[in-house]
Amino acid sequence: MFIRRLHTSSRRLTCGEALRACQQTGARSANGQLMLSQHVQEFDPEMYDILTKERSRQKRSITLIPSENFTSVAVMNLLGSEMQNKYSEGYPGQRYYGGNQYIDMAESLCQKRALELYGLDPAKWGVNVQSLSGAPANLYAYSAIMEVGDRMMGLDLPHGGHLSHGYQLQNGNKISYISKYFQTMAYRVDPATGLVDYDTLSETSKLFRPKVIVAGTSAYARVLDYKRFREIADACGAYLLSDMAHVSGLVAAGVHPSPFEYSDIVTTTTHKSLRGPRGAMIFYRKGIRKVTKKGTEIMYDLDKRINFSVFPAHQGGPHNHTISALAVALKQAATPEFKNYQTAVVENAKVFGEELSKRGFSLVSGGTDTHLLLIDLSPMGIDGSRLETILERLNIAANKNTIPGDKSALYPSGLRVGTPAMTTRGFGPAEFGRVAAYINEAVKLAIGLKSQEPVDAKDAKTRLAHFKSFCAESEQVTKLANEVADWVAQYPVPGEL
């Protein structure tokens, strides 16, 4: 390091200057300053090797997990920036640390862009951008408007809901701690249609009297009827909290109905279809909530309650590098290019579904209105765990998923796939048709390998372990995996253009 500096100097150093430079370099080395300026490949080759392998995996594999995406170089610039060095407990203009004038600017800009992106009047809506991720954001929102033991309703997990909506098993085992903090009751889809059963929800909510109804999904391919949710919530006196984590990018681009018109609170992650950093936002109404029969105006008080729930009730200092990166992503989401991207995401999903259906796959609800599809594998003689396993071997990342009627999340009957990530990389209808063909081939291979499992292996975990070994040893799987990797590697990831 010192020699390089001597050579790049604009003039020759005197003996005294050289000696002092050596002494200063030694001092910096002793207290670790030189280490702090090293790049990861220089200081930690082991970790850099892992990073390199993950980069290669992303480049040479097909990403179908609908909650994943490839964020932009500009977002990555902020995530690895000096913005992460600052502590800033509190909110803009009300911090518990000094030196936050530029952090305040970044967070305020992020809030402004969030409201503008969704066409929200700052007099009627506010937004908190400090939540670290989606599940915590939901907890913070619930805690702001409920006491421990209050009641809430959310879509059942096997029917397309999310853990953070209060999932518990039919036997009463509380899987999500949300169901320990609050009394939760699930609503479900109609088995005949695969669509939310609003009529049953309407009746049960009048009996259960929840304080919150959650309109949100993680594996539901159809548009939610937010107006109907509002009517149901009003009939039982509940808040309507819409969790648009999966579709926030689609909503921003206007290719999916917006929940804001009908909701009291809207939560979302920021890294799925919105294509930003891994974070979350909580939007909340301000102003008049309702007017009584006597003409008395009942005002919202969500502003203070939600902000207090985030900090100091649940979190300390926010992640300023994430908030700054989110501000960039929100600016990107307001562009015509982003709208074109989201239009393609939805169109690709429809084509993908059609191509899968042509090959005999059954889709829960019969298709999709969004970015994702839920495949029912039960008629095909294979389960989601085995198909996920062999697809991973084939350099295709998808995820096993429960479908209505499933009793096990470890060995479910469904596979969840989506189009956001590969649409980012340039996939269109033709490419997703080819992916459907790969999945079809994977099912055939999986059925053949499953037939080789020992008949005396009664334990499901043991049988799956045998299946994984067969996948690793299969020459057919290896050959197809190389074909997939070589093909998808031709499509750029952000930063390569």
From Swiss-Prot:
Keyword Mitochondrion: yes
GO biological process, any: tetrahydrofolate interconversion
Gene3D superfamilies listed in its UniProt record: Aspartate Aminotransferase, domain 1, Type I PLP-dependent aspartate aminotransferase-like (Major domain)
UniProt keywords, alphabetically: Mitochondrion, One-carbon metabolism, Pyridoxal phosphate, Transferase, Transit peptide
GO cellular component, one term: mitochondrion
EC number annotated for this UniProt entry: 2.1.2.1
GO molecular function annotation: glycine hydroxymethyltransferase activity; pyridoxal phosphate binding
Residues annotated with N6-(pyridoxal phosphate)lysine modification: K272
Catalytic activity: (6R)-5,10-methylene-5,6,7,8-tetrahydrofolate + glycine + H2O = (6S)-5,6,7,8-tetrahydrofolate + L-serine
Transit peptide: 1-27
Any single Pfam family the record assigns to this protein: SHMT
Pathway the protein contributes to: One-carbon metabolism; tetrahydrofolate interconversion
Cofactor requirement: pyridoxal 5'-phosphate
InterPro entries reported in the protein's UniProt record: PyrdxlP-dep_Trfase, PyrdxlP-dep_Trfase_major, PyrdxlP-dep_Trfase_small, Ser_HO-MeTrfase, Ser_HO-MeTrfase-like, Ser_HO-MeTrfase_PLP_BS, SHMT-like_dom
Subcellular location per the Swiss-Prot or TrEMBL entry: Mitochondrion
Physiological role: Interconversion of serine and glycine.
Family to which the UniProt record says this protein belongs: Belongs to the SHMT family.
Assembly notes: Homotetramer.
Extra information: In eukaryotes there are two forms of the enzymes: a cytosolic one and a mitochondrial one.
Protein name (record): Serine hydroxymethyltransferase, mitochondrial
Organism: Eremothecium gossypii (strain ATCC 10895 / CBS 109.51 / FGSC 9923 / NRRL Y-1056)
Gene: SHM1
